[in-house]
Amino acid sequence: MPELPEVQTVINYLNPIVSNQTILDVQVYKDKLIKNVTVNQFIEQVKAQKILNLSRKGKYILFHLANQITMVAHLRMEGKFFIYDNLKLMRNHDYIIFKLSGGQFLVFNDTRQFGTFHIVKTSELNDLKELKKVAQDPLEANFNFDRMAHLILKSNKSIKTILLDQSIVSGLGNIYANEVLFATRINPLTKGKDLTIDQVKAIFQASKKILTKAIKYNGTTIHSFKFGNNQRGSFLDFLKVHFKAKQICSICLNHIIRFKDHGRSIYCCPVCQNLTAEQLAKINLEEVEETKL
């Protein structure tokens, strides 16, 4: 699933192209992608409207329209936006097509069909149920660190699980949570309540640094994330532990390990991140060969 850097990369690509263009026509070929209104209502709300600009809330992409309506899109697992000069370029799984006044087409493609589109009044954006669940992300200028610290330090869950909870801090996802915990040398299985405030501060600072760098390199493409004209994110070249199972740790020269916790893969260095002998005895290391697709 695209995480914050990948979503921001998509926005950075689309914004200069679609902003100030008017949506002349809309075609929807997969009704279930439209969530809180009917397909006809969706088309009525966005057709003939100028796209003012795009922004982001967590992993949600916000298309702000001139009629004070915001189209809220989520890529989910495999969603992608493409810009076509003509519809001869269409490919399988192109499900929503926006014809733009500049002669181009903004196309939403989704092989898994898990993507979502909501329509909401811009003034009521924060009342949309899906967005109300989304906490601030570490790159927001007014990020409420005290709130995040309070929720982490009272939690009985592992810090890795906590960082994936979008209601506590948004945008990290599995890749960047693994990288942040390695950067801070924190054991991913440590319960939130067992961390110190200094460790939480370190997590916050590392999150900002890693997310910012990942955006600079257009996110991480491991399997299928692409943007623009099939461009790939290059932050994969800077990953320290994620997707590095059985490879050598750049710090201590021991091997990176991979195992499951609550259904999500943890990548970590058992030495640098101080996994205990008891923890290592309980986990089942995943015998998976890491392969880029």
Which sequence ranges carry the predicted segments?
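Gly/Gly-Pro- and Ser/Thr-rich, intrinsically disordered tail segments characteristic of DNA damage-repair
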Residues: 1-117, 125-126, 276, 288-293
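Catalytic cores of large soluble enzymes that bind and process phosphate-bearing ligands
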Residues: 2, 6, 140, 199
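A structural signal for alpha-helix termini and helix-coil/disorder junctions
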Residues: 13-16, 20, 48, 140, ...
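Basic, nucleic-acid-binding surfaces and adjacent catalytic neighborhoods in DNA/RNA-processing proteins
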Residues: 24-42, 55, 147, 151-293
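Phosphate/anion-contacting hairpin/loop surfaces
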Residues: 71-171, 176-183, 191
